[in-house]
Amino acid sequence: MDAFENMSVSNHPGGNARRNSQSANEMLASQIQDFQNIPRSFNDSNANVNLSKNCTVGNQLPFSSRQQKIIMEHLLITKNNSQQQKDYSHVPCKFFKMGNCQAGSSCPFSHSPDIISSANNLPCKYFAKGNCKFGNKCVNAHVLPNGFKMNSKEPIDITPPSQNNYLSHARSASFSTYTSPPLSAQTEFSHSASNANYFSSQYLMYSPQKSPEALYTEFFSPPSSSSSYINYSYNNSNINAYSPVSSSSSNIWQEQGQTTLSNPSVNQNLRYRTGPAIQEESDNEIEDLLIHNFNSRYCHE
């Protein structure tokens, strides 16, 4: 401390610059010499200083104040480092896992196969956050969403069995959806044909067993009031004079301009269709209308 004070005094304003530089070099050389003169027998672990035999407690230590300061700082640094050391015996050694640990038995990390194998199956929490600095050399498992590990070729199962079954079922369902062939034209045509014969098949299914002639006559005869077609009015001279009228309960065929239902609530649901409106109807209704017209005109003759 005296040397630093002398240097600060010699550097007062107005002093000689050459004299100041020479004195600074001399003091720096003396400090280096004093540091080299520290006894080799000094041990930092137990902080014991070998004193001379004729040195009593009241006498001064064989070190200057500057040397004592350096020694105390060194002791404090080593003491803090010893207190900050942790027990890493439960942490697997990543270098031993890779086969290049040079520490051997003095390695602070564990070389136990059980600890290393358990660490391999433990998912890395830093990889889940996206900031694992070890990469493929990490001791823990870098698990992908599909269940495989990036740093190993063996799969790891981290999901419950029920979830695995659900995922496998979802994958198989999606695979079958994408790999199923599209409907062919023949299939679509047969589907439309089945829709066209829907009412006739339902009628034949739930009707009692009758002869083909009776079924033909009953099917193509004008509907009665008890059937789904009510208030039927027919004119053989003109087919375009009739149009289908749909209601909430049944399909009604009636002549244009003629109101056949007396119930006001039913009349609100009636919708009159003219000749162009018939073209907008489905092919099934037009086909039924033409067949009914043909049979009623020629079969009874």
From Swiss-Prot:
Keywords carried by this UniProt record: Metal-binding, Phosphoprotein, Repeat, Zinc, Zinc-finger
GO biological process per UniProt: protein polyubiquitination; protein ubiquitination
UniProt biased composition (Polar residues): 7-25
UniProt-recorded Gene Ontology molecular function terms: ubiquitin protein ligase activity; zinc ion binding
Gene3D superfamilies reported for this sequence: Zinc finger, CCCH-type
Entries under Pfam families matching the protein: zf-CCCH (PF00642), zf-CCCH_4 (PF18044)
Keyword Magnesium tagged: no
Start and end residues, zinc fingers (C3H1-type): 87-114, 123-145
Modified-residue entries (Phosphoserine), positions: S21, S30, S282
Region (Disordered): 1-25
Protein's recorded name: Zinc finger protein LEE1
Organism expressing this protein natively: Saccharomyces cerevisiae (strain ATCC 204508 / S288c) (Baker's yeast)
Encoding gene per record: LEE1
